[in-house]
């Protein structure tokens, strides 16, 4: 990489660290190219991204960001997985790490919080923002549906009573 390319890469990575909901750092030594491509495609499908960066450039890019506390994670062959949704990157990384023991999660960050391996695992078990929004909408709609049912019930009962009287009059 030439110096200008490095500057551009550091700027791009700095923007990633500032805009991401969560960042996960992992060692990938021993992961084959096919496995890495599979991992990248799974992350892309979920709405995240995986980048391999030189540790020195990643540490420079971390300066001045909320994620600056995770600079000590960048040792050895590291990759960076990130997403806007704070749950997506940890979930995809942990799912891939279950099936591939060569991918070793080192930690990460979410906003100003530096995450340990256990914290990344905990984040991976949480539902995504879209799932939480769906649950919230369902919880909000349930009382409205019940109120509508209660309000309609007396009218339905009256209609059945009138229908019964009408049938009774026709029969007589």
Swiss-Prot record:
- Output the CDD domains linked to this UniProt entry: Ribosomal_L10
Tell me one GO molecular function of this protein.
large ribosomal subunit rRNA binding
What SUPFAM superfamilies does this protein map onto?
Ribosomal protein L10-like
Pfam families according to UniProt: Ribosomal_L10 (PF00466)
Report whether Ribonucleoprotein shows up as a keyword of the record.
yes
One Gene Ontology BP term is: translation
State the superkingdom: Bacteria
> What InterPro entries does this protein's entry cite?
Ribosomal_uL10 (IPR001790), Ribosomal_uL10-like_sf (IPR043141), Ribosomal_uL10_bac (IPR022973), Ribosomal_uL10_bac_type (IPR047865), Ribosomal_uL10_CS_bac (IPR002363)
Q: Does the keyword Hydrolase apply?
A: no
Q: Which Gene3D superfamilies match?
A: 3.30.70.1730, 6.10.250.290
Q: Relate the assembly described in the record.
A: Part of the ribosomal stalk of the 50S ribosomal subunit. The N-terminus interacts with L11 and the large rRNA to form the base of the stalk. The C-terminus forms an elongated spine to which L12 dimers bind in a sequential fashion forming a multimeric L10(L12)X complex.
Q: Which function does this protein serve?
A: Forms part of the ribosomal stalk, playing a central role in the interaction of the ribosome with GTP-bound translation factors.
What PANTHER family does the database record attribute to this sequence?
A: 39S RIBOSOMAL PROTEIN L10, MITOCHONDRIAL
Q: Which NCBIfam families match?
A: PRK00099.1-1
What is the protein name given in its UniProt record? Large ribosomal subunit protein uL10
- What organism, scientifically named, is this protein from? Allorhizobium ampelinum (strain ATCC BAA-846 / DSM 112012 / S4) (Agrobacterium vitis (strain S4))
Q: Which gene encodes it?
A: rplJ
């Amino acid at each position: 990489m030439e110096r200008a390319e490095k500057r551009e890469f550091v700027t791009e990575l700095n923007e990633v660290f500032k805009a991401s909901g969560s960042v996960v750092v992992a060692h990938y030594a021993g992961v084959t190219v096919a496995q890495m491509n599979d991992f990248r495609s799974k992350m892309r499908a979920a709405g995240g991204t995986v980048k391999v960066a030189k540790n020195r450039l990643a540490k420079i890019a971390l300066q001045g960001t909320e994620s600056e506390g995770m600079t000590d994670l960048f040792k050895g062959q590291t990759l960076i997985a990130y997403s806007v949704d704070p749950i997506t990157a940890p979930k995809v990384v942990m799912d891939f790490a279950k099936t591939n023991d060569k991918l070793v999660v080192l930690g990460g960050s979410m906003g100003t919080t530096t995450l340990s391996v256990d914290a990344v695992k905990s984040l991976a078990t949480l539902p995504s923002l879209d799932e939480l929004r769906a649950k919230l909408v369902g919880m909000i709609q349930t009382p409205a549906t019940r109120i509508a049912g209660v309000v309609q019930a007396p009218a339905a009962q009256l209609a059945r009573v009138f229908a019964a009287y009408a049938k009774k009059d026709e029969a007589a």
